[in-house]
């Protein structure tokens, strides 16, 4: 009894089986491996033969395994069998001559064994075969330079340059010449470099070189030549001109106390380059003027140049409305007087475009900006009203109109307490435009904000009468009545909408009608609408599926709805709802079967199966599987006498019906024979 454990509480430190296994694995001892001893040349030859057979066997199974080739060659090198190693490398290159790591390993092995000529031959072969692989060229030039063969290195670089390589190759060539103080050669290379890569980075690199190896005049010549070249490439434009080139030149002049030269360069850049491409240049110029000039001087210079640029552009194309917008914004931001800004506005709106609505869109926004500026910034209410009137008078309303202008004018009058005038404006707009949908919507939204719902109804009556073929006005009208709590009026509007003989996208109205009845908890009415829609669409498959899915969402009469955090009702699917949905699926199945719509039945089966996966049990799933169609390939004869294959479906229930019908027919024949 004394040996019995009295404290049966769990130990403070619990050890799991996983910990035991992990500790055992970590403490396992490495098995001793017997070192293979080779006693004589015969054993060595046998060992080498065996290893070669292993490598050759592996390569016969997979010749494309480049790693295996290189391991084979490395092993031969370890055996000091250089001829065999070369043979392995050559065979590997025959399999894949474009594999760069194989070339590099082959070359490195030759260099390691000090077989210089072999390595040179390999490098020459490699760059001849793969002239676009920079790594091979870099290896080649590094080898020649390491060997002290500068002339040979230069010759390799020249061969490389004929292929117009990337900028890193040119930079390496220039740096090589700089290391040996061959500045004239480096300068010649840079001339060719900017020809092949004529961007701003190349010119900056050349200018930086001249700062180290040349003098001020040569630096200026390089910068000037670079800017002239880039401008000429763009046929006098600035598409290729980069702010870094101008900023670098200006910084160079600043370091040498040539402040006027630097200021001229900054001014030139800000004048020529667009704002999106001159942010750094402007920042540098600001810092320059803070240190060496006056802030007012900067702003005046920049604004003057900008205005000059806009004026030049507008002389070429007075109808460039984007430039007019930029010009007006510049005037507002620079603090021009109101009369000066008004003059720019008047000049802009005087350029009336031809009667093309595409061109008029930007033009109309000039008028809108003008009117808003007069009203809100200048507080000139009468002037703003005159602008709206003038704008309306010049629009060719017989061809097109702009609902936005009418609505903004009406809102302007409302802001200034003139509601009757606003209604007159919108009524006039509807009359002159023939009733644009956007104008109807804006007018109705305005009256709704004012809580004038009777006026909204009158407007909707005209709206749906004018655009009876559109679904949107009908749905918006019904939603208004639903919001006002008039269920009967909303239902009447929906019924009138679905009775329209022609309508674009009528399915939207039907869908919203069903949702309306569901929201009002009139589920029997919703079912009746589905039946009506099935008659209208001749039993369309999508309607059947939607009908079945709807039944799942219908709660039981005594069911209490639960609401989530977002206020949405969460309905628990009852067995009664599942039964109703299955009934609809079954009815749809029979209807499609009677109409011989096989493909639609397949779609219905997939939807039914998804329903059963989510809501069904084993029995319902098994019952549905009995209906599963089987795809079969069949042939049919075309009009030209040829045959084509197509996929048909065989339904098990159809085959059972055929078998049962045949059984009844045989029974009838047997009965007739017995009676006779």
Swiss-Prot record:
HAT repeats lie at residues 46-78, 80-112, 114-146, 148-179, 181-212, 215-255, 257-291, 301-333, 336-369, 379-415, 417-449, 451-483, 485-519, 521-553, 576-614, 620-652. Keywords: mRNA processing, mRNA splicing, Nucleus, Repeat, Spliceosome. Residues 616-636 are annotated as: Disordered. Residues 616-628 have a biased composition (Basic and acidic residues). Its main location: nucleus. GO terms for biological process: mRNA splicing, via spliceosome; spliceosomal complex assembly. One of its GO terms (cellular component) is Prp19 complex. InterPro entries: HAT, HAT_Syf1-like_N, HAT_Syf1_CNRKL1_C, Syf1-like, TPR-like_helical_dom_sf. Signal peptide: none annotated. PANTHER family: CROOKED NECK-LIKE PROTEIN 1, PRE-MRNA SPLICING FACTOR. Associated with the spliceosome. Involved in pre-mRNA splicing and cell cycle progression. Required for the spliceosome assembly and initiation of the DNA replication. Belongs to the crooked-neck family. This is Pre-mRNA-splicing factor CLF1.
